């Protein structure tokens, strides 16, 4: 049922997540430890549409977009471990809690997203995750969220 895959490149991510540009917000997952934890990477570029309006002349990645990138990292972790590539899998937010934003994330930053499973197991639909997003070792955001995994 589970695999020993410990990372995911963009090709594998696209085989797991239904998201596409401009809403695919994780570029690679460099560490996957089963359904326990993962480290995702988002290369932040000026080409992303949200920077047109957030904010003109001073682009800052919206906090909700950081949270979404973290959720996508968690979904990739679960999808890789449960071998969901090329299968029907959708993930829906149920709750977002304890969201805190500590520093700006701007074009040129590399956002590192460390996610941990707080509750959930293979076969279960409701999962809870905690995560920290950082840039150059400095915390940018932290959050806990609950998601429903609809695996078709």
From Swiss-Prot:
SUPFAM superfamilies noted in UniProt: Thioesterase/thiol ester dehydrase-isomerase
Keyword Zinc: no
Pfam families, alphabetized: FabA
Keyword Cell membrane listed: no
Active site annotation, chain numbering: 54
Summary of the function given for this chain in its UniProt record: Involved in unsaturated fatty acids biosynthesis. Catalyzes the dehydration of short chain beta-hydroxyacyl-ACPs and long chain saturated and unsaturated beta-hydroxyacyl-ACPs.
UniProt-recorded name of the protein: 3-hydroxyacyl-[acyl-carrier-protein] dehydratase FabZ
Gene name tied to this protein: fabZ
